[in-house]
Amino acid sequence: MKNRNLKQPLMFVLVAAGLAVPAAAYVGPGAGFAFAGSFFFIFIAFFVAIFNFLTFPIRALVKFIKRIKTLKYAKYKRVIIIGFDGMDFHLFNQFKKQGKKFPNFDKVANQGTFNPLLSTEPPISPVAWSTFSTGANPGKHNIFDFLTTDRNTYMPKLSGSDIRPPKRNIKIGKYTFPLSKPRIELKRKSKSFWKIVASKGIFTTVLRVPFTFPPEKFSGLMLSGLGTPDLRGTQGSFSFYSDKQGEDFDISEGVFGKLEKTENSENRYKGKIKGPVNPFVKGNVPLEQAFTLTVSRAEKSALIKIGKETYKLEQGKTSEWIPLHFKAGMIKIAGIAQWVLEDVGEGRPIKLYLSPIHIDPEKPVMPISHPRIFAVYLSKLLGPYATLGMAEDTWALSERVLSEEAFIDQVYTFHREREKAFFDSFRKCKRGLIVQVFEATDRMQHMFWRYLKNSGSPADKPSRESRVVDAIYESYRAMDDFLAKLLEKVKEDDLLIIVSDHGFNAFNRGFHLNSWLHREGYLVLNDGKTSSGKWYADVDWSKSRAYGQGLNGIFLNMKGREKYGIVSAGKEAETIKDEIKKKLAAVKDEEKKQDAIKSVFKREELYRGPYTVNAPDIVVGYNVGYRVSWESAVNYVSNNGGALFSDNVRMWSGDHAFTRDAVPGIFFCNKKIAVNDPTLMDISPTVLSALGIKPESFIDGRDLQVHK
């Protein structure tokens, strides 16, 4: 990195010393976090690099000795773990029964093993991938949902990472200068299997495993996956621009920007890109970068000028990665984004989409890899690439800001980037462990399940294009194509394991869990209120005994735990939990004449370990077709004319927040195994055993006993 690229962050520490805004209502780490670690990250990395350089000979010798001791017991030269997020065992077999071909999956199955893979309870990505990573049940790794609850505010917060603002600040007029640095903490507990492997001196690379942000420090290479924020500090906020007013469009998410005509021009417009919050100014004021857009309706294209650079946009096509820079004084923060000119037709409003602004991997302002230089190295190898955890913009598709075709293009663009990164790392791994998760299958199933025959989805299915209608099958086939390239390189003394964290099924009806808790008297509203706004805006906590949080959880309002808790531990709490369990188990969707809920668990019935106390008090397991409603997921207590269920008409029509036996994942291995009922928990001890390492005592999973 050139010295001039370091000067601005180095100057920044003199006045900013790291800044973060507490978790905001959209449940991101907090807008403004792009500045949170920008200098401290580089400053500390600089001195760590010097220390590492000076101590390298000693560390290399120790690592070599450990490696020699371990490898003499290893059964395989390389262990390769591939994750296909959300690939469903039943759907895979259904495709095969329809005559669809997966020759490379078949090759692995015929040579070794193909089984369903039991997920976690609930079978959702943060819980499942954390169990995969550690081999431990959630009571030992501390991840129970996408969200957990802030006991002081009852607001949701991300379960996987904790962003804490500086403890000390100094205010001078309208400016604020932090005097201490922010803290970024990975909330997952227990050791990952790759950390154990790397500690034995074995070369280890981990790419985009979900819930690895911030990347843990270990003697290997890591690029963080799901959970990594965008430059605004959110989990992915797109922008939408038009020459019409925002109220002309039905958009509830994202950032709307008005395109204003410039003087003396009929086809030139100006707009502003909203960046991270300015850390020096009160009021959460975002930094901005201006752009001009010159449209050609006849050619269905436009020229967009950002800074000194001009780029051509063609209607319906995704742009290249375009660099963006936001300045706060002398500090410049780098991001990258993609544009899609969705519509510039004659007589129609201009529709311009801007992706979430990704952290620029060439100049990362917060830790997205370990070591930091690894993300930079990949950018030199690949060019700009997606760094946001949930890079595929499902919200923009749901809001109809992004077309189905453009979304599919986006998914495969990111998939190709990840393939390139994987094969580069694979080529360098002559002996050791490499782990990679691909996410195209998950994203396609979430958004296109409605197109499957017999899905029963009430959601809109506007397309007749085979690329859209068959998007899920095509994503499975794309994974088979990837496997073809990999199998050409896999040797006899390599162990290949392919897994998914869960399967999939239809999400057709939403259950208003918080409305049910209100109706049953557990969640009480302020006097005169029959419904509550977002984030429990109108709840009377002094009278409430229970509330929903996340996709599957219910928390009691406990004395001494929640700020306004009223439920006493012991008999009272157990009585309430027993009541809720019994009543929920009897809930029926009267309109559809179906049971909505398959099982209800107390947390102690599912989890064991020191972090069980952080789990929801009750975990709800939904029947296929049902899930917590979109309203309850963001803490509305909705009236809905008394209805407890509503159709899910969003494009997000597939899901997996059911019970784990309803959505098994897939397990492939190029060797036979002795166990015929593998679980996600078993992957960690199996990998350790294959590399000659005894699994540690905290691990709950079994060694699958791979046959040599």
Model region roles, listed by residue range:
Residues 215-218, 506, 577-579, 586-615, ...:
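Polar, surface-exposed loop/tail segments
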Residues 1-25:
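N-terminal secretory/membrane targeting signals
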Residues 185-188, 477, 525-550, 566-578, ...:
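A short beta-strand-to-alpha-helix junction
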Residues 64-113, 699:
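Active-site-proximal N-terminal segment of extracellular/periplasmic enzymes that hydrolyze or transfer
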Residues 500-551, 607-665:
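Histidine-centered active-site microenvironments of extracellular/periplasmic hydrolases
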